[in-house]
A protein has these predicted regions:
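Surface-exposed, low-hydrophobicity beta-strand/loop segments enriched in small/polar/acidic residues
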Residues: 1-69
C-alpha cells in the first residue's frame, strides 16, 4: 500500500513508535494510522521504507509505503 498514514510522535505515548525502518512491523494506533509494534500478533503491516515522524506534533501524520500482512 502506498501512502498509508504513520502516527506522529506527538500522538503516541512513546514517540519512538513513529520512527520506523524498512521491515519494521506496524500495528494500529487506534485512530486509523500505524505505529511500530513489538507485540506478538499485533502487526497489520510491515514498513517498506524508513520514515521518522517521531518529532512531529500531534495530528501531523506522515505517509509511508507498507506491505499489508
Amino acid at each position: 500500500v502506498k501512502g498509508a498514514l504513520l502516527a506522529s510522535g506527538g500522538d503516541l505515548s512513546t514517540a519512538a513508535d513513529a520512527d520506523v525502518s524498512g521491515g519494521t512491523p506496524l500495528g494500529s494506533s487506534d485512530d486509523g494510522s500505524l505505529k511500530a509494534t513489538t507485540t506478538a500478533g499485533a502487526a497489520v503491516a510491515v514498513a517498506d521504507e524508513a520514515v521518522d515522524n517521531s518529532g512531529a506534533a500531534a495530528g501531523e501524520r506522515a505517509r509511508i509505503n507498507v506491505e499489508v500482512l
